[in-house]
Each structure stands twice: as C-alpha cells, then as structure tokens.
Amino acid sequence: MITAQMVKELRERTGAGMMDCKKALNEAGGDSEKAIEILREKGLAAAAKKSGRIASEGLVKTYISEDGKVASIVEVNCETDFVAVNADFVNFVDNLAKQISLSESTTVEELSEEKYISDDSKTVSETLVNLISKLGENMAIRRFERLAVSKGLIESYIHGGGRIGVLVKLECEKESEILKEVAKDVAMQVAATNPLFLSKDTVDSATLDKEKEIFKVQALNEGKPEKIAEKIVIGRVQKYYKENCLIEQLWVKDSDLTIDKYLKSKSKEVGAPIKISNFIRFEKGEGIEKKEEDFAEEVRKQIEGK
C-alpha cells in the first residue's frame, strides 16, 4: 500500500510533483529507489529541479479555425528569450493553441492531463516535461482562453513575435469581408492601448467606487471645495472611461473617431450592426516577478548543478 508519507518523502528527495511521485511508487511496487529511477527515466525528477526557477519569458500564441468561428489564445513561459525562439518550443506552443481550440478543458490542470494533439501516446504534461529536460529550462503553461461565435467572426493579432496576443470577437448578422478588417483593427487597438473594460457599462461598481474616491481625494488635496470636488470627479470619471473602456477610446488609426464611431461607420458599409462582444489580451510575463542575478552567481549555480 502506498502511503501519503511515502509520497511525501519521495517528493522531498526528487522535487517531482505529488501525482508523479504516487504514480512512480505504484509502478515500482512501493520501492522508493525504483520509483526514483522511474522518475529520472521520465525526466520528471530533472524537470522538478528546474521548477523553482522563475519562467517569465516565453510566447503568446493564438489559433483560429478556418471559418473564423472558434479561436484560442495561450501563454507558455520559459526562462530565457533564447529558448522562446527555439523551434521545438515554438512548435509546442503552436500545437497547444490548436489543441485548446478543440478542447473542453477550462483549467491548465485539465489541459495538462489531455492526450497531446500531435502525439497521443503522451499527455500534454508529459510532453512539456520532456521539453523541459531537452532544453534545460523551467517551462509552464500559464493560462489560456477559448472563444466561439455563431454569427460573426473572431480575429487575432500577435505583436512583437509573441510578446502580446489578442483575440477579438465580433457579432454581426451579415457575413462580410469587412468584418475581418474591423476585427483586425480592433485587435491592434487592444494590443496598443490595453483597455481594462469593453464599455463603461461593464465597469464593475467596486472599481468605479474606488476610482471616484481617488479622484475626490485628489481634488480635495488640490484645495478644491467639497462641491467643486464632486464636479471634478464627474469629469475625471468620463476621462477614465475614455482611457480604459475599449468602445470609448479614440481609435489609434484616426484620433477623430472613437472605436464606437468607427464601428458605426463600418456597420453602415456592411448593412448590419457590428458589435464587439468580447476581447482577450495576453502579454507575456505580465505580473511575473523577474529574478535578476549577476553573472558570477549564475556561473556558480551552474558549477554546483543548481
């Protein structure tokens, strides 16, 4: 019988994941030494040693079905920009983006347990572990999203060779080549301006209340009377909408138009209303703290095998 203590001890000795340790122990009939060999053979122990290292580089990739009705976006991280352009790494991220578009998984954990799209003898997790062992860097599937539309289309935009990725979902009752042009323009807008919300109607009350409080304190700190401060808040809220809500933003290609006005003009050309129903923007490594190390320390760690 495999006990929790056995799994814990093996994990401490190898650094491998809990489930991997449990599987190895079962395969080894409870023999810890044999389980270590199994983990090493699978590259899991070696991968685990790298798992504590910060992976803030990587790629954002998208995939769109031929009919433009289904799309996916994924971010996979690695440690260096050198590995981020490696053909094997790029191929893995491309394949993963396609797999996500066909998948019903909603979490990275679920996706990791799926059979890998280009080699169903391995799971996504096993394929990633093999890639970690081959390229010698920690890697992680960080996040992904999937969009689908029945009437309309989805378009993507990748900026900086995978530094920023965007999906934009348009809804329209009529099919038109103009939709693709509009979606691409909006996707570039999202990449450039990083809006927080689709429209002012989608700004949640907690965020709005917080911003109003900040604006009021700012006005009072500027020496404005209470009543004047309240009027200033109204103006600054409108400015906040214009800066952070996609529909309210000035179009980067023509600052005489807002995105809303641009959509209305294109809707007339198509002969039916065009609506942005969703957008997703991933920026590689955003929110991940990058670890800075000096060269001497890096060499020392390599010599010590860390």
Curated annotation (Swiss-Prot):
Its main location: cytoplasm. Gene3D superfamilies: 1.10.286.20, DNA helicase RuvA subunit, C-terminal domain, Elongation factor Ts, dimerisation domain. InterPro entries: EF-Ts_dimer_sf, Transl_elong_EFTs/EF1B, Transl_elong_EFTs/EF1B_dimer, Transl_elong_Ts_CS, UBA-like_sf. Signal peptide: none annotated. CDD domains: UBA_EF-Ts. Residues 80-83 are annotated as: Involved in Mg(2+) ion dislocation from EF-Tu. Keywords: Cytoplasm, Elongation factor, Protein biosynthesis. GO terms for cellular component: cytoplasm. GO terms for molecular function: translation elongation factor activity. It is found in: Cytoplasm. Belongs to the EF-Ts family. Associates with the EF-Tu.GDP complex and induces the exchange of GDP to GTP. It remains bound to the aminoacyl-tRNA.EF-Tu.GTP complex up to the GTP hydrolysis stage on the ribosome. This is Elongation factor Ts. The lineage of its organism: Bacteria, Bacillati, Bacillota, Clostridia, Eubacteriales.
